[in-house]
Amino acid sequence: MISKINFVKMHGLGNDFVVVNKRDLSSSYDLSQLAKNMADRHTGIGCDQFIIYEEHDDFYEMIIYNIDGSSAKLCGNATRCLAKLIYLDTGKKDITVMVGNKKLLCNVEDENNISVNVGKVSFNEVWMPSRDKIWELAERYMIDLKETICVDIGNPHLVIFSKLEPQDQKIVGEKLQAKELFADGVNVNFAEVKDNKIYLSVWERGAGLTLACGSGACGSFAAGLKLGFIHSPSTVVFKYGSLTMKEENGNIIMQGAATLVARGEYYCEQ
């Protein structure tokens, strides 16, 4: 039997998503498999992550799947996209999004300026692998471990303040997913600082290198503040645009654009 699913295609600075309202999904769907199918760029719609949302009385719940069908704990760009979608559909400007137990406060200033308060981050050494385990990688790719830091922003990020070529970013990103290094994988941020701006590339666990990463921007901004490389406010620059970052009372706030690409129907065999 073939069923129809309404979807929205959106992107934040090139980081793209297929977004579906939970009310349009049958309870019989295997959501992990559906995510893999719809995310496929050859046989599906194509995206970096698959987003399901549900409206509640005073917040919207967001569930995130990676292209490999695994779940993700946070996505800053997807949050901005969802906030814009809700604004376009309802006119609401102040929107609360829940991802798991993480509350994200969003404000739509206009269609091209959406801010998300992601709250406080922690610099969590608990899941940092022992230095000797990554010494070989650091030595081979000239990574300064004194300028490498773990940030937990609701999902785990390893921020490396060293310039690596794209082909080396791919290799290092893949190698750091090894279970003996990070049991659940890790998002790897390659950050370069110039004139109080962070130029960022991110290897996302479950997705690989993406054109932009909102949570990576937040984590890298927080890491840059802690290490004294930048001050607030700052800008995080990606290939297709930038995010404005600031810190207020310990909370990290990002602001940037989100783009609606298309609305359509996906036909699913059950």
Swiss-Prot record:
GO CC term, one of those recorded: cytosol
Site (Could be important to modulate the pK values of the two catalytic cysteine residues): H157, E204
Active site, UniProt feature: C75, C213
Gene3D superfamilies: Diaminopimelate Epimerase, Chain A, domain 1
Alphabetic keyword roster: Amino-acid biosynthesis, Cytoplasm, Isomerase, Lysine biosynthesis
InterPro entries (UniProt xref): DAP_epimerase_AS, DAP_epimerase_DapF
Signal peptide boundaries: none
EC assignment: 5.1.1.7
SUBUNIT field: Homodimer.
Name recorded for this polypeptide: Diaminopimelate epimerase
Gene behind the chain: dapF
